[in-house]
Amino acid sequence: MKLTWLGHSCFAVESGGYRVVLDPYYVESYPPLHTSANEVLCSHHHRDHAFVEAVSLTPRKDSPFTVQTVETFHDDKGGTLRGTNTVHVLAAEGLRVVHLGDLGHELSGEQLAPLRGCDALLIPIGGFYTIDAETAKRVADAIAPRVVVPMHY
């Protein structure tokens, strides 16, 4: 499995010649994103996480990934300020990658269960519309991944 940071909260995850792009962005202060993928997954529908126009879709073939989702919120007020956020868990080659999107709160035990012990945790740390670094540390400690990759800072 290959994991590539493309900017902001956008990553490409590849396995067996199949490429998934997570949270493609349009942010005026960042270089434009131009990439290709077999599949695009978005945590929520704000253009800094769901600018699918930046991704050229290549013909789909059978995906080596299994994808699990965990519903969370984009804020710490049950989604009343910024709505929902979908966490994606991608598994292939015996590895699991968790992309937390624009997580805005600490996770419940039920939300943590499918994330615990993942191989790579992609976690927002910026504190602006997401959890901050201190909260991110608590979330990461609860998930206990092999590797933590900060994003959205």
Feature locations, PLM:
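Proline-aspartate-enriched helix->loop->beta-strand connector
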Residues: 37, 120-123, 127, 136-153
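Conserved helicase ATPase motor motifs in RecA-like P-loop NTPase domains
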Residues: 43-45, 151
